[in-house]
Amino acid sequence: MSVDSEPKPASPDARAGTTAGVLPLIFIGVLLAILTAVALLSLTAGDTGLVNVYGLTVTRVLAEIGSVLTVGSLLFAAFMVAPKKSGVLEVGAYAALRTASWAAVLWFFAALVSVVFNEADAINKPVGEVLRSDLLFTLIGELEQPKAWLVTAFIALVVAAASRFAVSWGWTATLFALALFGTLPVPVTGHSSAGGQHDLATNSLLFHLVAVSLWVGGLVALLVFGRRVTTGPELRLAATRFSATALVCWIVMAASGVINAWVRLPVSDLFTTSYGLLVVAKIAALVVLGGFGYLQRKKGVQAITDGGTSGALVRLAAVEIVVMFLTIGIAAALSRTPPPGVGEVPDAVALQLGYTLDGAPTLLRLLTAWRFDIIFGTLAIALAVLYLLGVRRLKARGDAWPVGRTIAWLLGCLTIVIATSSGFGRYAPGMFSIHMETHMMLSMLAPVFLVLGGAVTLALRALPVAGKDGPPGPREWLLAIVRSPVSRFLTHPVVALVLFVGSFYVLYFSGLFDVALDKHWAHLLMNAHFLLVGYIFYWPVIGIDPAPRRLPHLARLGMVFASLPFHAFFGVILMSMTTIIGERFYQGLGLSWANDLLGDQQLGGGIAWAAGELPLVIVLIALLIQWARADEREAKRQDRKADTEGDTEREAYNAMLRDLSERS
């Protein structure tokens, strides 16, 4: 008779052996990525500036490898293994955190050197000439890519320094989010950010790069640090979580890669241009990686789940890592190769917005001229689907969930889609008045519906509880975010109010809006800011979910009324201004049906002044209903207390009378 037993932790020799085997593999992968990028560029680069081209390519490969290793190590430390009950990282997670620090150092230096190479490449000058002159600092202010590399270098430096001191789960998760954000500045200012359809190209590329960072970095971290944890439950947990992450990443990479190639490359150029051949090579590598991912799930992860052995995982991942780094090399060469037709200049509207605007924004066009926003449209759909799955899980176990909350959440998601993907989203970058309408929808309407949906409460009820001895999961991570000092600070009434109303004045009256108008990534940040700040403001006011700060209903009402004059004054200022905000950008578009820029701005001011009325009505109704229900619950509680304990005040009074009667 056999007895199942818990697998024993790997011995130090076994762990060292695994690490010693993986590190040379990583070195070979890095070298292969560099050689691949250089070799492919030798087929496509011209005769001038080869040192700059190759230098920038090599430093870009090193920066990307440093970034994915940083992200992957932090992913492993924060989410693949459980911390101690005190919140301090376990040994394997701590080792991953320290490795992230060193990887971020590589990322920092490679990004910093890329600033110089990028400037030299942009003006076709030797690197030495750029360093010896005052061009180095002058070009940073004039060129987008050097600025992006400098921002990336700064983020990498912060992550490298902070990772040396962090020991808790909270700080590790924060550094993971920061590192992931640090991978974005460079790609949003590259090929995908210019020319026709650059909005679709940029949005899909952001998804693509995040997925690459999580998949490649996560796999390397799992191999290097997984054995430091144990071959028992912790390793199984890490392998299972990474397997699920890898599957999602592969789907995202495939979908976003197809979209990016589709907007950049006609099918006829797929096999007849250098850019097309590089795309084909990258697609082939992605298919191979998908095959290895499938084998990992079927053999490697399954073997760990069944018996705790990681041999199959290591063998498959070894080849997978090599292919991954080869793909990074192809991607680096692709980023340095102009797509076909890059010399063709589209009209001013398509050049600035990525698409054309066919006539004035009539009501019919606003409702029918859709252009799906890959980021916010996908986000809204994902939020709606996850919410409905949570409701279905509750109903499957017999728990009720109010229909009104579901309707509110779906209306919030629909508002996001309409604001970013309908004709409103299409015309918003080209007209100030339409932009203000989307601004109001994202900051004052969608958040109202979302906070009334109570998604956090739904998630806490639907997600499994880790238990006393179980590893923290999504439910515990969500609770940590809600209870974090950052959430408590942001939901302070004064802070929330200042963020909500102050953002209007800072963005439009400081010159930031003028600077941001011709940058697609800036529009993405504005939309995200509007939505997030609106949610932060309305959450403690009418939110169903428990906020870090529970305010009395009178204080909530005060927050709402305190914001009204600031919104009204903002709209009045816009309507009375004679200076046109973003005048040069809007004039450059040359829209024949939008010549009256001042009138359009005044219309936008009127929208800002009046648009708060409908959300205000919804907020006041919701707040008064919640107030009445809270009073009703309190009255019922007092009644139950009286029924169970008796009317203590009346009994005390009667006892006093009896006592007086006896004395007399």
Feature map (PLM): residue ranges:
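Polytopic transmembrane helical bundles with strong interfacial aromatic enrichment
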Residues: S2-F372, L598-L603, I607, L614, ...
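Aromatic-anchored segments of alpha-helical transmembrane domains
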Residues: A111, L180-V188, A255, C413-S421, ...
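Functional transmembrane alpha-helices
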Residues: G66, V188-S193, Q197-R227, N260, ...
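Juxtamembrane non-transmembrane "cap" segments at the membrane-aqueous interface
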Residues: V342-A350, H567-L591
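Early transmembrane hairpin module of multi-pass membrane proteins
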Residues: Y54, R60-V61, V68, A111-N118, ...
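Juxtamembrane membrane-water interface segments of multi-pass membrane proteins
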Residues: S11-R15, A77-L97, V220-R241, W262-F271, ...
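Secretory/periplasmic and organellar redox-cofactor proteins
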Residues: E476-R488, D596-G599, A642-L660
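Hydrophobic, lipid-facing residues on alpha-helical transmembrane segments of integral membrane proteins
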Residues: A104, F108, L247-A254, M441, ...
